[in-house]
């Protein structure tokens, strides 16, 4: 029922995906061409940035760099990216043409509740809990999330109770 994410400071779960076979689960992905950034590949993009399909209106958030031409993402609306459409990345300002759209594994995010691990007495590990009326997953899961981190080489950070919103 409860799956630990094994880390604190998770602020958002972007997606939970269940594999359809014995392989690892995967988020949706797109292949792109004609990227107009300095390196003309996905190294010009910023993980976590939003991007929009100019004809479909689909909005995604970039999660993983799969290769020089492919990224993994999650949809932020109900529209779907289309082959041959132009996508515009908001932070890097890169545009590209979608050449292939892969739907990825089934997104079962709505089958779970997310808990940050924060409570009034202590700050614990983040987790997801399966909703009571949902059958347990039978295949591998992959959870994509955003979390706060600190650079261990940075000697200037101080964290207090006011550092966390809640």
Language model: regions and residue ranges:
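Short, surface-exposed secondary-structure boundary micro-motifs
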Residues: 56, 92-93
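Glycine-anchored, exposed beta-strand/edge motif detector
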Residues: 89-92, 99-101
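Polyanion-binding and phosphate-handling cores
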Residues: 81-82, 88, 94
């Amino acid at each position: 029922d409860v799956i630990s994410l094994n880390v604190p400071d998770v602020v958002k779960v972007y997606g939970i995906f269940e594999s359809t076979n014995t392989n690892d689960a995967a988020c949706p992905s797109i292949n792109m061409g004609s990227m107009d950034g300095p390196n003309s590949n996905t190294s010009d993009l910023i993980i976590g940035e939003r991007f929009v399909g100019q004809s479909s209106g689909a909005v995604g958030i970039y999660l993983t760099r799969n290769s020089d031409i492919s990224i993994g993402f999650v949809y932020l609306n109900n529209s779907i990216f289309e082959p041959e459409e132009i996508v515009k990345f908001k932070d890097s300002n890169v545009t590209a043409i979608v050449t292939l759209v892969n739907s990825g594994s089934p997104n079962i995010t709505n089958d779970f509740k997310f808990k940050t691990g924060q409570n009034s007495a202590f700050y614990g590990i983040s987790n997801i809990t399966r909703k009571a009326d949902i059958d347990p997953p039978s295949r591998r899961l992959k959870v994509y999330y955003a979390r706060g981190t600190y650079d261990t080489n940075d000697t200037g950070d101080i964290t207090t109770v006011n550092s966390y919103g809640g």
